[in-house]
Amino acid sequence: MVRILIPSGALGLGYDPEALERGIANRPDLIAIDGGSTDSGPSYLGRGVSKYARSSTKTEWAGLMDAARRAGCPLVIGTAGTCGAGLAVDWLLEITREVLAETGQSAKIAVLKSDQNPKDISAAFASGQVTPLPAAPDIDADLIESCTNIVALAGVEQISAALATG
């Protein structure tokens, strides 16, 4: 059996420190947390920024980094920085490096980015490789190419490959 500890629905929403400690006592194989949600709408992805304040994100992330260190297991975040855009991933990576420097710790970090070039997506749309979801508004090449951030979904395969690097 694999034990995965999920301390909260998303980084930045807060978590119960006592529940986290109880979870660590159960010797998790992995601590995982989501960094965002589509519930917030497209604004954060469009701007490439996090919904949550840097200070609260840093405080929570530092606590989870410490928990993973004490548990001796990997820590994984999905959709870093609320939206998973490259700028938001870089923002969380910067926070991670700050926490490591401030605590004198080191860590092996795998960074998965899925930013897509709007021109490539537009070409795929034109050739029928990309299609709108049912009930989606009409789109065209100009609309696609005007997007500031387009990210692809990453499946378990990418995360598993990153974890396999040690």
Language-model regions: role of each:
Residues 125-166:
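Core active-site phosphate/anionic-ligand binding loop and the adjoining beta-turn-alpha structural block
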Residues 1-124, 140-144, 148-153:
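Metallocofactor- and cofactor-centric catalytic cores in central/energy metabolism, strongly enriched
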